[in-house]
């Protein structure tokens, strides 16, 4: 049970990184375009 929970947390962190990566790049691009 604890092992499944660890796997779920790792998948959640991986999903956050995959989603946050392009989001941060997009924010930096938009901020750079405004300037």
From Swiss-Prot:
Family indicated by similarity: Belongs to the Psb30/Ycf12 family.
Entries under Pfam families matching the protein: PSII_Ycf12
GO terms under biological process: photosynthesis
Keywords, sorted A to Z: Membrane, Photosynthesis, Photosystem II, Thylakoid, Transmembrane, Transmembrane helix
This protein's record includes keyword Thylakoid: yes
Residue stretches spanning the membrane: 7-27
Protein name stated in the entry: Photosystem II reaction center protein Psb30
Main location: membrane
Role: A core subunit of photosystem II (PSII), probably helps stabilize the reaction center.
Subcellular location: Cellular thylakoid membrane
InterPro entries: PSII_Ycf12_core-subunit (IPR010284)
Top-level taxon of origin: Bacteria
Entry GO terms, CC: photosystem II; plasma membrane-derived thylakoid membrane
Bilayer topology term: Single-pass membrane protein
Subunit and partners: PSII is composed of 1 copy each of membrane proteins PsbA, PsbB, PsbC, PsbD, PsbE, PsbF, PsbH, PsbI, PsbJ, PsbK, PsbL, PsbM, PsbT, PsbX, PsbY, PsbZ, Psb30/Ycf12, peripheral proteins PsbO, CyanoQ (PsbQ), PsbU, PsbV and a large number of cofactors. It forms dimeric complexes.
């Amino acid at each position: 049970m604890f092992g499944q929970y660890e796997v779920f947390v790792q998948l959640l962190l991986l999903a956050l990184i995959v989603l946050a990566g392009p989001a941060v790049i997009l924010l930096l691009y938009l901020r750079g375009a405004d300037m």
